[in-house]
Amino acid sequence: MNSGSQPQENPGSQSIAIKATGGGAYKYADLFKERLGIIFDKEDEMDCLVAGANFLLEVVHQEAFTYMGDQKQFVQIDQNDLYPYLLVNIGSGVGMIKVEGEGKFERVSGTSIGGGTFWGLGKLLTECKSFDELLDLSYRGNNRAVDMLVGDIYGGMDYSKIGLSSTAIASSFGKAISDNKEREDYKPEDIARSLLRMISNNIGQNLGRTTPQKLAIVVSPRPYEPHIGI
């Protein structure tokens, strides 16, 4: 598409067809055709997503990883025992898809609280002008300055009877209720970090309740790294 020259409007009757998927393939189809002479050959978004995930899991070495706390560990997937698995697609919202084989899948759940929620609320709560700026800001923050932890309720102790550590989040943004502080007393990076944790935890809880699959695959270009997380 980039030949070094500027694209011209209405380039005549000659058209170029390219594969496209997702909402933009429909939303911008007329614009691309009128301005660039490009016709979108549309492919189903979920078909492409599942096919791509299957390919990565079956072919690419160390494409999958898991997190334990803040530590990332790559894992090897047994291609002979891959299915079924749950594919969690995090975009503006979140879709959860049960994949049972090549071309065999169904959407089993989802939530409207996703990447769009993080960006929308983050834009309202901070002065960030882009998603990447908000994400970078969250990496520098400390959610403990904003979130109410189990230790805040139990005097710094674990609630071991039910398996809750003192560092577990009891209430996202909970300290904003109890602290004698004004809005400007809270650092934007701490707010961004708390928001990211809140949304990520919500997705994880929805995932855990959805289906007892042996393997759950989380895919998202952001806020996660561009690999497949288990």
Describe every region a protein language model picked out.
Residues 161-228:
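Adenine-nucleotide phosphate-binding core of ATP-dependent small-molecule kinases
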Residues 15-19, 76-77, 84-89:
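Short glycine-aspartate micro-motif
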Residues 5, 41-85:
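Conserved phosphate-binding catalytic cores of ATP/NTP-utilizing and phosphoryl-transfer enzymes
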